[in-house]
Amino acid sequence: QTAQDDVFLYYPRDTAQTQLEARADADPSVLDRMEASYAAYAASRYTAVPDGYDELQTLCDEAKKDQKLTEAADIGDYIRAYLNTNYQYNASAPQPPEGADPIRYFLTESKQGYSVQFASAAVVMFRMFGLPARYVVGYAAPQSLFTQQEDGSWHAILQDDNAHAWAEVYISGQGWTPMEMTPGVLVSAQQADLRTDPLPETQGQDTAPAAGE
């Protein structure tokens, strides 16, 4: 594999939040209108649930009512615990039969998978809770891959086994927020240690997050 010239800029979430707050202070009406418009778009575009998941919908409805789950973080914790408890990580998980629904196959038959299956199932469940959610594919980059350049920047060459999938939930005022659902991988942006989750070869070493879509 040859190195590519692609450069991905990294903007820490706290930096983005500071910039948004500064813009809101300067002209809150503009930001509010933009936020309201996109929130409406996200709600119309990213909340559809496929047919045939009645039992899972009932599970989510009961959890929302019984545990009073309304915040995205709490809902994420519930979904993560449910998936990590009832399903097994397997980088060599069997593929669904031709023509089968891959998410339903994961949830009801194989009950094992890697980041693709965990993220896909999580997106469906987030939507069942009423939250706009989407499926994202990118990379999880080990810290060891990064080398500092003379200009102070950090570069890394990412390969196929750094590929990773995760769910993102739209939260008003924050935008699309990553929700990691794969067992053994980063849960929140504040956590320093996580493992890569190749698609679908083998899990790797401690890593730092690198996002793509």
Locate predicted features.
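Secondary-structure capping and boundary motifs in well-ordered enzyme cores
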Residues: 99, 107-114, 118, 159
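Hydrophobic/aromatic-rich core segments of domains that either
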Residues: 116-206
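Acidic low-complexity segments
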Residues: 1-109
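Gram-positive cell-envelope targeting signals
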Residues: 79, 207-213
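Active-site-proximal helix/loop capping residues that flank conserved catalytic or ligand/cofactor
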Residues: 18-20, 77, 113, 165, ...
